[in-house]
Amino acid sequence: MYAIAFDLEIAELKKHYGEPYNGAYLEIGKELKAIGFEWTQGSVYLSNDNNLATVYRAISTLSKIDWFKSSVRDIRAFKVEDWSDFTAIVKGA
């Protein structure tokens, strides 16, 4: 599986997207979900498959959103080989 992680500059996001700016994150989530990514935490999304073409489609889609292009500080994609969820252990469940 692959992951996409990004960081948006809030001041730029407010300027180019508007208020409430957190709606931008919902829009990004919808776009990525349609391509095959699931939100994990923060601004990290995991693909449902092991295909770099899915990553390419996601990056291509995001690059067509003007307010995203103007607001993104950093965006990276990487391969995830092992993914372990320790939430239940930390919460004592």
Swiss-Prot record:
UniProt key word rRNA-binding: no
Domain of life: Bacteria
UniProt keyword annotations, A-Z: Hydrolase, Nuclease, Virulence
Keyword Nucleotide-binding (UniProt): no
EC numbers, comma separated: 3.1.-.-
GO molecular function: nuclease activity; RNA binding
Gene3D superfamilies reported in the protein's UniProt record: 3.30.70.240
Family statement: Belongs to the VapD ribonuclease family.
Oligomer and partners: Homodimer.
Physiological role: Cleaves ssRNA, mostly between U:A.
Name of this chain's protein: Endoribonuclease VapD
